[in-house]
A protein has these predicted regions:
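FIC/Doc superfamily catalytic core
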Residues: 1-278
């Protein structure tokens, strides 16, 4: 994993040299991509172009379920909330976590009446029932509040430390895995966990990591294998692969555009500044 981290740091250096994040509309389309892939993993059927049209112009995709549109608009609003909270160095608390979850589930959450009480997923309430995913049985609902309080306290301490890019990246992956393993909500845990990962990356001014929808099977396998073996290195390696994939794609996109621009100018060097075309 150390070699992979070194490769990632070299890619980050190249990424920064190209000033990719300064490109016109780069951040907007990057956030759209995060929304598209994260919701697609959870079943949303809109294409990437349909996601862009929905978030850019409010246009719905013909023949696609309303639920899938709601998932995407809610996730986008939650991502903007996470961005602002991280940029303001907002302490990571249980209340902040619930606010993120409430935004993710705002349009698709429901009130649940159980023998243990009533909870509302659209309000970011913790589950009051036990949940399973395949062969995995997550922690008893009665333990969720205490575990989340501990999770938030430890994350808040870790995130506010003077740490380097490697440490911040690994922290974001570990938080992603640990929150998903607690599974505090009845629904939306995957999306919320990926947003918490993005919160840490925003906080430390790192490019955001995507989990690509094409790699959903490997993503689930990494989660399962990590739990079975109690070895977080498995999930870290998978996420580093996703991060490398994202960085390489962005760098390649810019380099290809540079080549096209250079050819159009007869091989003359480009002026400083980049424009990305989507």
């Amino acid at each position: 994993m150390e070699e992979e981290l070194r490769n990632i740091m070299q890619l980050l250096k190249r990424y920064d040299e190209l000033e990719i994040q300064q490109a016109i509309d780069w951040e907007k389309y990057n956030l759209y991509s995060i929304v598209h892939h994260s919701t697609s993993i959870e079943g949303a059927s809109l294409t990437e172009i349909e996601t862009q049209l929905l978030l850019d112009e409010g246009l719905t995709a013909k023949g696609k379920p309303l639920l899938h549109h709601q998932m995407q608009t809610d996730h986008y609003n939650a991502l903007l909330f996470v961005k602002n909270a991280a940029k303001e160095k907002t302490p990571f608390t249980t209340d902040l976590l619930r606010q993120i979850a409430a935004r993710v589930m705002r349009s698709t959450g429901n009130v649940h009446n159980t023998i243990n009480g009533t909870f509302d997923t659209s309000k970011g309430d913790f589950r009051l029932l036990n949940v399973y995913a395949g062969e995995t049985r997550f922690v008893d609902f009665s333990k969720v509040p205490q575990l989340i309080q501990q999770f938030c306290s430890e994350l808040n301490t870790a995130i506010s430390q003077e740490i380097n890019k490697e440490e911040a990246l690994i922290l974001s992956f570990d938080a992603h895995f640990n929150l998903l393993s607690i599974h505090p909500f009845e629904d939306g845990n995957g999306r919320v966990s990926r947003l918490v990962m993005n919160f840490i990356q925003f906080y430390h001014s790192l490019p955001l990591c995507n989990v690509f929808k094409q790699d959903k099977t490997d993503y689930i396998k990494a989660l399962v294998d990590t739990r079975k073996s109690n070895n977080i290195e498995i999930f870290r390696r998978f996420m580093l692969g996703q991060y490398r994939k994202m960085l390489e794609a962005e760098i390649s996109k810019v380099m290809n555009q540079e080549k096209k621009s250079s050819s159009a100018r007869g091989g003359k060097p480009n002026d400083k500044g980049l424009t990305l075309f989507f």
